[in-house]
Structures are given as C-alpha cells and as structure tokens.
C-alpha cells in the first residue's frame, strides 16, 4: 500500500473540491492512484446525488445566454433547495454552461420523459423501415431500433448530451458533480431557446 501524503490529499482536494477526509479515504482505497481516486470520489458523489434526488427544489435562478451574433438566445430554469446555493458561483456557472449548451445543441427536452411519445414512435418507424430496407433479419431489427433510439435520446435530451466544453462528460455528469460539491439536489426545470428567423 502506498503511503498517502498530505500533499497528495491536498492535490486531490484541489482537483475535486471534495472534503479532506474523503480525499484521504479515496487515496487509501485506490492505493495512492490519483486518477482512480478521482473516479472513486465521482462514484461517491453520484451516490450522494441519488440520495438527494427526492428533495424538493423550490429555489434557484433563471440562467440566460445570448450568442455573440445576437441571433440565438436561451433561458434556462435551474432549481436547487436553498437560496444560499442559488447565489453560489458554481451554481451560477452551471446555469450559464447549460444555457450555452442549449444554444449550441438545440435539445428538444431536458430528459427522455420530456420527449413527445409520438415523435419517438415516428423515429422508431423510420429506423425500423431503414433496417428492413437494408435487409436486416427481422429478429434483430428491434435491437437495431432500440440502439438507434438510445442514440437519438443522446442528441435531443439535454441531460444525455456530451458537454460542449468537455465531450468526455455528459450534462447529467456535470449536474451530478455540482450536486456532490454543493451538497444539494439540483434540477433543470425547463428551458426556452430563441433563434432569429426560425
């Protein structure tokens, strides 16, 4: 087992914003491997996010973004539990990043639940016809369609999209990381995207 130094703990803490004891435990669990410790903390953070998911989010703010060309604008409702967190710089930055994401990618809904069922059925029919036209066997067409629908959700659902500033993360990860850091449930209420001439 590698010796865990105060410098290692400090460095991990600066990278993750996790508590000092959590960083020390993560390094101990991962035998001093910083990359694995970051993953360990993220997994712990995700479980924190899951525990907080049932809490009411009645505070928050409206984040906005106007593209530099002045032709695209976005408003996004970001909700949290307390006004203290709503005024936090990291929360405000998250709202700004979400608004920029929406401006760039034009999602249809926050998550899968917000996508119109008729739209999904139309997409399913298109993918099914395409697979059959390509001569795919009937028994694997449904698997192909399911895979195509999952890919479609990643394109049209905000929480499933790759983050425009770091495509190794999806927006859900960004949200969960902020929940873990701030210690409160955070949800995206709704959003509105305007585009001149659209």
Swiss-Prot record:
InterPro entries: EF-Ts_dimer_sf, Transl_elong_EFTs/EF1B, Transl_elong_EFTs/EF1B_dimer, Transl_elong_Ts_CS, UBA-like_sf. Residues 82-85 are annotated as: Involved in Mg(2+) ion dislocation from EF-Tu. GO terms for cellular component: cytoplasm. SUPFAM superfamilies: Elongation factor Ts (EF-Ts), dimerisation domain, UBA-like. The keyword Cytoplasm applies. PROSITE patterns: EF_TS_2. It is found in: Cytoplasm. GO terms for molecular function: translation elongation factor activity. Keywords: Cytoplasm, Elongation factor, Protein biosynthesis. PANTHER family: ELONGATION FACTOR TS (PTHR11741), ELONGATION FACTOR TS, MITOCHONDRIAL (PTHR11741:SF0). Belongs to the EF-Ts family. Associates with the EF-Tu.GDP complex and induces the exchange of GDP to GTP. It remains bound to the aminoacyl-tRNA.EF-Tu.GTP complex up to the GTP hydrolysis stage on the ribosome. This is Elongation factor Ts. It comes from Oleidesulfovibrio alaskensis (strain ATCC BAA-1058 / DSM 17464 / G20) (Desulfovibrio alaskensis). The lineage of its organism: Bacteria, Pseudomonadati, Thermodesulfobacteriota, Desulfovibrionia, Desulfovibrionales.
């Amino acid at each position: 087992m590698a010796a865990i130094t105060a410098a290692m703990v400090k460095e991990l803490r600066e990278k993750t914003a996790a508590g000092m004891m959590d960083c020390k435990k993560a390094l101990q669990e991962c035998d001093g491997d910083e990359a694995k410790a970051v993953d360990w903390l993220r997994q712990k953070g995700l479980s924190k996010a899951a525990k907080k998911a049932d809490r009411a989010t009645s505070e928050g703010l409206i984040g906005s973004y106007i593209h530099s060309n002045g032709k695209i604008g976005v408003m996004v409702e970001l909700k949290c539990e307390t006004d203290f967190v709503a005024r936090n710089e990291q929360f405000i930055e998250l709202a700004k990043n979400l608004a920029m994401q929406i401006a760039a990618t034009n999602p249809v809904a926050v998550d899968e639940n917000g996508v119109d069922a008729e739209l999904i059925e139309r997409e399913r029919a298109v993918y099914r016809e395409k697979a059959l036209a390509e001569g795919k066997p009937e028994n694997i067409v449904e698997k192909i369609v399911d895979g195509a629908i999952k890919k479609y959700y990643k394109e049209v659902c905000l929480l499933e999209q790759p983050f425009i500033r770091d495509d190794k993360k999806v927006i859900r990860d960004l949200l969960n990381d902020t929940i873990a850091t701030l210690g409160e449930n955070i949800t995206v209420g709704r959003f509105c995207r305007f585009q001149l001439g659209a």
